[in-house]
Amino acid sequence: MNETFSAEQHDARERVVPAQPEHADAAKDAEQANPTPPHASPEPAWKGKHATPVNLVLEGGAMRGQFTAGVLDYFLEHNLFCDQVIGVSAGALNGYCYVSGEVGRTCFLNMKYCNDPRYLSMKSFVHTGNACGREFAFHEVPEKLEPFDFQAFTDSPITLTAVSSDLELGEADYHAVRDLGRNADLPYLIASSSMPLVSQIVEVDGKKLLDGGTCDSVPIMHSLLTGRKKHIVVLTQDATYEKGPNKLMPVLTQLYGDFPYYLDRLRYRHVEYNRTYRQVARMHEAGELFVIRPQRPVEVRSMEHDQDKLLDLYAQGYAEAARTWNDLQEYLAK
């Protein structure tokens, strides 16, 4: 099994970036490395294929979403097209590339731009008020630098729901993202990935929204309430992970003092998060859903700039999808 796992990891790495010089300076590598783009394809991966009536629930985690990217690329390459995706934060960003059927796109972008301060950095936060540069990441990159297949997203048999946090209600907001080309639903995708403290509030349709992870980190209950019988959940932390209280609550209290319900969710997020992780594990053991998660503690930070760590986490996700593939097929066939 270990040999198979290693082979899958190697394959995942080779498909995304070229080999780097063994003795190159790490900082220089990070600055100059130029990942190869996803394999060019005239058609999205789902073209001419059937979508499977399954809900795919994707946790966030900023750059830890590289694990999810590896899982989803394996799914696309092996013709598993879940027809409903429910994504939180980085999960929503991974989700919209899955919907468009573009294999390798998420990993390619994260690898290529992880050291560009306009993409995701505290430098971007200082200059724009957003750690994730909205103009750069959501406009310049998909519209000019690395064109996104907006038509494929629109035509896809897969639908995406982006999960955000409504500051005034202190509840999760679930929005079907159908139109990115005319920016009709783009604010909801941006809101879902707008981390508190380092992002400006997104105001859309009379709502004030931020990152969905605060109010529903793993939206399994929302998925269950859709009435679906099959649910695949991709997590970005291993089974030993336990979230602790937010050490920045004094700062958050000052910043979001006008939103008491939202503050309560921030204050007790670790309790809800750990409870959800336990619930998901129990449901997986009972065969009520299927979980794919890292097998060891994740060392990638939210704003990771180390390409080697990012690539390794992507390879872990790809390999874990391969390792659990037969079990997943058995679950879906029941």
Region roles according to the model:
Residues 2-88, 96-334:
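Patatin-like phospholipase
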